[in-house]
Design a protein with these regions (language model features):
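N-terminal beta-alpha lobe that positions the nucleotide/phosphoryl donor
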Residues: 1-164
Length: 164
């Protein structure tokens, strides 16, 4: 594990507080970001430093602003970003942007997110790795004859899941 000294937590509320607690236990400095609507939120007071993001944006858009979060990370000298969960935590473009900015992303690699980010791709990765999987089909189109044939081949009962 890399030795980060200052971690920007790119999330809000209880999620940010939980990440902050863990980082504090490791002796790391924490940086909070907060949207205007969260300026009185506990996470913006519990961190070592706190910076407002997303001027003129709503709260969700503020926390989804890759540019805004990276701007704060660079300005305050954070050497790592922890995304928490939700928001940018599953966005491979955010991971790429952190890497390009020279800031470590605490989480999976962008390639891993891309491979496992949808059910069909994740299934192929599992099969290639030798992980047992239940019978299924590849993503089907709109040809009802093909769909019926694939359903019969897999067997009943069936469970249908959207793949995108």
């Amino acid at each position: 594990m890399a030795d980060f000294q200052k971690i920007l937590i790119a999330n809000r509320g209880e999620i940010a507080i939980r990440v902050m607690r863990a980082a504090n236990e490791l002796g790391k400095r924490n940086v909070a970001v907060y949207a205007e609507e969260d300026k009185l939120g506990l996470h913006s007071f519990k961190e070592d430093e706190a910076y407002k993001i997303g001027e003129g944006l709503g709260p969700v858009a503020a926390y989804l602003s890759i540019e805004g979060i990276l701007r704060v990370a660079k300005a305050c000298g954070a050497d790592a970003i922890h995304p928490g969960y939700g928001l940018l935590s599953e966005n491979p473009d955010f991971v790429d942007a952190c890497t390009e900015a020279g800031i470590a992303f605490i989480g999976p690699k962008a390639q891993t997110m891309r491979q496992l980010g949808d059910k069909a791709s994740a299934r192929r990765v599992a099969i290639e790795a030798g992980v047992p999987v239940i019978p299924a089909t590849e993503v089907l189109g709109e040809d009802m004859a093909q769909i019926k044939a694939q359903a019969a081949a897999v067997g009943y009962p069936l469970m249908l899941k959207a793949s995108w």
